[in-house]
Regions:
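Short, Lys/Arg-enriched N-terminal segments with co-localized hydrophobic residues
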Residues: 4-22
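N-terminal beta-loop-helix "entrance" segment that forms/cooperates
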Residues: 65-79
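Short, glycine-rich nucleotide/cofactor-binding loops
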Residues: 26-41, 73
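Histidine-anchored nucleotide/phosphate-binding helix
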Residues: 40-53, 59
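A glycine-rich helix N-cap at a beta->alpha junction
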Residues: 76-103
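Short internal beta-strands
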Residues: 57-62, 99-103
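Short, flexible loop segments at the rims of nucleotide/cofactor-binding pockets, characterized by
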Residues: 75-80, 116-120
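C-terminal structural segments of small proteins and small subunits
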Residues: 109-131, 135, 140
Length: 142
């Protein structure tokens, strides 16, 4: 039996008592980097919204998006209508979200373990992205 719960988006985020007891798994795959700040920030905003709704959220950064894990980028980048990267990142990190950062893309762009230090993040290879996608209930790509 499948039960669908609907929350009217015009009423703001669902309160804790309105959330379904089942927590879904959400994967947000971001490939847009500092060259596309609105799209990059939108990916993190959607991940944050998923966390606010009570879902388990994983974010996989690949391609140019690996640069988003750097503090200088987090602190300086905002999207048009999608907010500050730092605010969304901090909310995700504080809420138990986890970041996977493409090891191959990182190597090509000079992102190192030092850039991940103190963050809920780890370097990952493409097979991890495939595993996350098959484990997720829903996947969004930005």
């Amino acid at each position: 039996m499948t039960v669908f719960l609907h929350h009217h988006p015009g009423l703001g985020p669902a309160t804790k008592s309105e959330r379904p007891t089942f927590m879904g798994k959400l994967l947000v795959h971001i490939t847009s980097g500092p060259e596309a700040p609105t799209r990059a920030a939108l990916g993190l905003l959607v991940a944050r919204a998923g966390m606010d709704e009570g879902h388990e959220v994983s974010i996989f950064l690949a391609g140019d998006a690996v640069q988003l894990i750097r503090d200088a980028v987090l602190d300086s980048l905002s999207g048009l209508g999608t907010g500050s990267l730092r605010e969304s990142f901090d909310a995700i990190a504080g809420g138990g979200g986890h970041f996977y950062v493409s090891g191959m893309s990182s190597k090509a762009r000079g992102v190192t373990e030092d850039d991940l230090a103190g963050k809920p993040a780890e370097l990952a290879m493409p097979n991890r992205l495939v595993q996350l996608a098959f484990d997720a209930d829903r996947t969004f790509t930005y």
